[in-house]
Amino acid sequence: GGIPRHAFGIRERGTLPQVGDNLGIPAAQAVAERLSQGMLSSKHGGGVVGSSAGVSGFDLIKRLLEVPKSAAGNATVAHTDGSVTSIQDAPQGGKYVFIDNERHYVSPDNTLLVNAGDKVEAGDVITEGYPNPAEIVKHKGIGEGRKQFVDIFKKALVENGINTQRRNLEILSRGLINFVRITGNEELSGHLPGDLVDYDSLSEIWKPRQDSQVLHPSKASNKYLEKPVLHYSIGTRITPSVSSNLKKFDVPEITVNDSPPPFEPEMIRAMENLSKSDDWLVRFGGTNLERSLLDSVHRGRTSDLRGNSHLPSMAIGEI
């Protein structure tokens, strides 16, 4: 779950980070400070430029972090692979876009980005505006979801007159988008079906299944990654766009399986992130403390004082 010091780059003091440095705290602080300054400036300056169906400023940032299941003006995301078979006027206004006969509603506030005959993949954004990041994570996986979240969040900040380094957003996305839901019928590393599990922790102990194959990306269409490659995470489906990107970076082979792994990606709202941690001390930084503590006792959860979170060390007075 750590970050190589050279991958992070030079810090604000002009040196590479030391092994053991917590990079999440300064990254979150840098983003929060810029956000606060931007909101104060907009308050005294008469608003901000840039919106998505009337949503802008702090409301837009909050929407991207809290990922409500439905919100007026959200960009439409394709739920399936296929071709755009037809585009029809909706009686309530807006459009119906049919992708292989599956209907997608497009708000009249959003401009279509596809035409009849276009091919799309599940998770593609088919209108202008800001999509719900959770939908992208659901269809494209943890890794691609993190990447697109950074792009979306960066765009939202810039359009509202706020700038920050991309690497800070990358660290933020890694913390926010890091859960999978166990879907198999059997226990997986101590977790039961339906459990929400930390992806980084699970990926460290995950071993490719016995019937997995090592193939060239061009021969792995519609199979599922068993080992991470580039920014793509375990369980990512090899679609034409994924295959094309792997070819672009000269990836010679990947480990894949015909079936998805027994878990699926799930992005939860930022406010619930800490309370869903596997570490019982980290949970004390979240909400619903009584329920979290009782669940931790029931599951026999432990705490790692040398883990990625600063909260356990803070709890025992080390920092």
Which residues does each predicted region cover?
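Intrinsically disordered, low-complexity regulatory segments
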Residues: 1-319
